[in-house]
Design a protein with these regions (language model features):
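A recurrent flexible, glycine/aromatic-enriched loop bordering the glycosyltransferase active site
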Residues: 157-177, 192
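A conserved acidic beta->alpha catalytic loop
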Residues: 29, 43-52, 110
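Acidic donor-binding loop at a coil-to-helix junction in glycosyltransferase catalytic cores
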Residues: 192-199
Length: 235
């Protein structure tokens, strides 16, 4: 499996609360496609095995990769605990702590399938966000893309407008930003959901652009607590 080049510095930001079922799969999918990224886990008081599983992937600084090739399956992972959680507050906190300029926000129950950092970073020169295709998965079954999932087509779209929601549409299931943009235009920390849509509206008012690119792709797995799934039918 081809990975992105070693000299690309990137931080993944993953928000968690009791994500033991998928968090290991999510992290492994990142390591399979991106060389030694920084991964920031912004955790909202998980009470299951989420954080124990995360620690399986933490890089041991004493590990010599030349002597232990399996070290490629580890990376720099930091666990950040947040009080008074909201989606926007968690992202803003992770951005503040991120070491790298390129930031990927990914759901804890998404599996990264495709990413071309060279291409996406180039697109960030003309767009403040690149968000990607999501394939809805329920109990292993790929679902027909209805309701919110119908936005995730096979065509690139700049400044996507949702007729379903009657507003501009970005989805942080898998999305790439520059740190300096997110520091200048942080997410609304008071919103309990849809922080990405409100952010899109703010960006449009600033006469900036964002891009949907299906060549950035993730499988989005069903969870009982998943906000994207709560208002959707499973079939």
């Amino acid at each position: 499996m081809r990975k992105n080049k070693k000299n690309t510095k990137i931080s993944f930001l993953i928000r968690t609360r009791n994500e033991e079922r998928w968090i290991g799969h999510a992290i492994q999918s990142v390591l399979d496609r991106v060389y030694r990224p920084e991964i920031l886990i912004v955790d909202n008081n998980s009470t299951d095995n989420t954080l124990r599983i995360v620690k399986y992937f933490q890089h041991d600084p004493l590990l010599n990769e030349l002597d232990h090739p399996s070290g490629k399956n580890y990376t720099d992972i930091r666990i950040l605990n947040i009080k008074n959680y909201t989606p926007g507050a968690a992202i803003n906190y992770g951005v503040k702590k991120a070491s790298n300029e390129i930031i990927v926000i990914m759901s804890a129950h998404c599996i990264l399938k495709k990413i071309n950092l060279k291409k996406h970073i180039k697109d960030l020169n003309n767009n403040v966000c690149i968000f990607g295709n999501q394939i809805p998965i329920w109990e292993g079954k790929k679902l027909t893309k209805r309701y919110i999932w119908s936005h995730f087509t096979n065509t690139r779209v700049q400044n996507m407008f949702s007729k379903l929601e009657n507003r501009y549409f970005i989805h942080n299931g898998i999305a790439i930003y520059k740190k300096k943009i997110l520091k200048k235009y942080p997410f609304d920390k008071y919103l309990l959901g849809k922080e990405d849509r409100y952010w899109a509206a703010k960006i449009i008012k600033k006469k900036l652009n964002f891009l949907y690119d299906p060549s950035l792709e993730a499988e989005h797995h069903y969870t009982d607590g998943g906000s994207t799934w709560r208002i959707q039918g499973k079939v």
